[in-house]
Structure formats: structure tokens, C-alpha cells
Regions:
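Generic hydrophobic/packing signal
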Residues: 2-4, 36-37, 44, 267-271, ...
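Active-site and glycan-interaction determinants of carbohydrate-active enzymes
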Residues: 183, 248-288
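Short, surface-exposed, low-complexity cationic segments
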Residues: 288-306
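Glycine- and acidic/polar-rich repeat regions and solenoidal domains
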Residues: 1-250
């Protein structure tokens, strides 16, 4: 999803084996061939990704801003967080100016650079999958060769946004006239945009954003997860729902997510009506208190996906 992905919604999908599924030798060929489940590039949002199953080593390439992830099951890493949005000039800054639009339209409203951030993570489940040696070799290569497009992170979780501000921290920079009442420096117009995270679960060493106050990190259990193709379709195989027992998360809605910063557009339906995330992957109704991830319960997770 590149450039003008404003208003895009990716929902109810199964992604797997999208990052070089077979063993390989880390090198230039692998660098140019490695993939991920979803790639969102230099867009200003809003881009909504909800109720998906992302099982590849690399879940989301997020060289962009204005993305909301809601009720997903994620086993791969976020890559290109904070990088991948310049034109690549060798000696001077070269940020790309990309278009944003009028709300729910195709008319260009303006052009702006990417500050990164302005992302939301609500009610997701992060499960660290075993890291294949070949993927670790590639991550070591790409993470240490000065690559400013893709560092090939293979650790899952929201921790890649460590150092990004909360909304309150970001907003405080603008106190007084043009921020002159703030204790911070004059970087407020160029620093990263804020991040929101709540209701997320982390397993197998998946790592939470440092400022997520209600993250649940399970260090007791080991979650197994895979997909199986049977004669009649694809099924999820996991013990995850033997471990998740409580329904502690609230229902997320358009109002929870707010507006994407640059286009000032909400995460809503194409007709402008609000979205209430009160149904799971299969359309099962969620109670007032619900569970993170794409399914309401173990029974739902055992249904045929496709």
C-alpha cells in the first residue's frame, strides 16, 4: 500500500510465508527479495489494519505514518519504523513529499513529509515465532550495513516505537506561542508524532512499547502457532486460547482511534460512518468486555479460516 493509501482498510486476512519461506544465504539477493505480510509506504493515513492473522517472519513494513492496528494476531517483526521515507541523497537530508487527500476523495489536498508515528495499536496479540537462523543472519546484515530503508527486524512487538512520545508528551511541546512556553527545544515540528497502545498481549518474548501502561507480557507460557492446509481449507493450529482466559479488553471504535494527523480524517467507513469493532474474524459478536486478537474464543479460533 504505497503513497495514497488514505482510507484503506485491510481486514479479515491470513498472511503466512511471505518473507523468503525457504532457507537461504544472507546476501544481496536476499536483501532485494525479502518480503513481509503487509507493506505501507509513505502514506499519511488513515490506514486501518484489523482482524488479520500475520504469521510471517516480517509482519509489517511501516515506512509511513497514520496506521491503526486493531485485533490482529502478529508473529513477525515491524520493519522500517522511522526510516525508509527519504529520497536517498548521499550528503543532505532528502525527505519525500507525498500527497494526502480530501476526506474520502481523490482530490489532492496537499503534500507533506513523513514524520513517522501517528500510529495506534489496540487489542492485538503478539507472539514471537522461532527465529530462523537465515533470517537472523539477514537481520544482522541489514541492521549493520547502514541500510536506511529496511533493517529487517525479526522481533515482534511494539517496542520499535520506543522513544516515540505519547500524545500528552507531544502536545506539551506546543505550550505557549509556537511552543515557546514549553521546556523542550524547537524540534517539536520535526520530531516523531505520538503513538497510542493499549490492550495488547505479548508472548514468547514479544516486546511491548516502553510507554504502553497496560501491556500484558506473559513470561510463563510458550505459545505454539502455525497454519495447516487440510482438504477443505486452511486452519490455525495453536494453544494460544488455552492460555488466554480472561476478557479484559474494551470495545474499540472509530472514536477510540481519533484522526490521522495530516489529512485530519478518522478511521471510519468510506461513507464516513463510524466503525465499531464488536465482531471478530468470523462475524461473532464481542461482549462489552472482549479478548485481544482476531477471535472471540478458542472455538472460533478452531474454525476453518478459508
Amino acid at each position: 500500500l504505497g503513497w495514497q493509501a488514505q482510507g484503506t482498510r485491510v481486514t479479515g486476512n491470513l498472511f503466512h510465508d511471505n518473507a523468503l519461506p525457504n532457507d537461504f544465504e544472507a546476501g544481496d539477493d536476499a536483501v532485494t527479495s525479502v518480503g513481509e505480510d503487509i507493506f505501507v509506504e509513505v502514506s499519511h493515513g488513515p490506514t486501518l489494519i484489523d482482524h488479520n492473522i500475520l504469521l510471517s517472519d516480517r509482519a509489517l513494513k511501516i515506512a509511513t505514518q497514520g496506521v491503526a492496528l486493531v485485533h490482529n494476531l502478529i508473529c513477525g517483526g515491524f520493519v522500517s519504523v522511522g526510516i525508509g521515507t527519504d529520497n536517498g541523497a548521499p550528503d543532505i537530508p532528502s525527505p519525500r513529499y507525498t500527497p494526502y487527500h480530501t476526506k474520502h476523495g481523490t482530490q489532492v489536498a496537499g503534500f507533506m513529509t513523513i514524520l513517522h508515528g501517528d500510529d495506534r495499536f489496540y487489542n492485538n496479540i503478539f507472539v514471537q515465532k522461532p527465529i530462523r537462523p537465515c533470517m537472523q543472519d539477514l537481520a544482522d546484515l541489514m541492521g549493520n550495513n547502514g541500510n536506511m530503508w529496511d533493517e529487517c527486524n525479526v522481533i515482534t512487538g511494539t517496542f520499535k516505537f520506543n522513544g516515540y512520545p505519547t500524545f500528552d508528551e507531544w502536545n506539551k511541546q506546543f505550550e505557549g506561542y509556537c511552543g515557546m512556553g514549553s521546556e523542550t527545544t524547537g524540534n517539536c515540528y520535526y520530531d516523531h508524532l505520538p503513538v497510542w497502545a493499549s490492550g495488547n498481549l505479548y508472548f514468547n518474548g514479544a516486546r511491548a512499547w516502553e510507554k504502553e501502561t497496560d501491556a500484558v507480557t506473559d513470561t510463563e507460557h510458550t505459545v505454539d502457532i502455525s497454519v495447516e492446509e487440510k482438504e477443505d481449507g486452511w486452519y490455525l493450529k495453536t494453544n494460544l486460547y488455552d492460555i488466554i482466559k480472561e476478557e479484559n479488553d474494551g470495545i474499540i471504535s472509530t472514536e477510540t482511534l481519533g484522526m490521522a494527523f495530516e489529512p485530519e480524517q478518522k478511521y471510519e467507513n468510506p461513507d464516513g460512518s463510524p466503525i465499531i469493532f464488536n465482531q471478530d474474524f468470523f462475524g461473532n459478536h464481542r461482549d462489552v468486555k472482549t479478548v485481544a486478537g482476531p477471535f472471540t474464543d478458542k472455538k472460533a479460533s478452531e474454525q476453518k479460516l478459508f
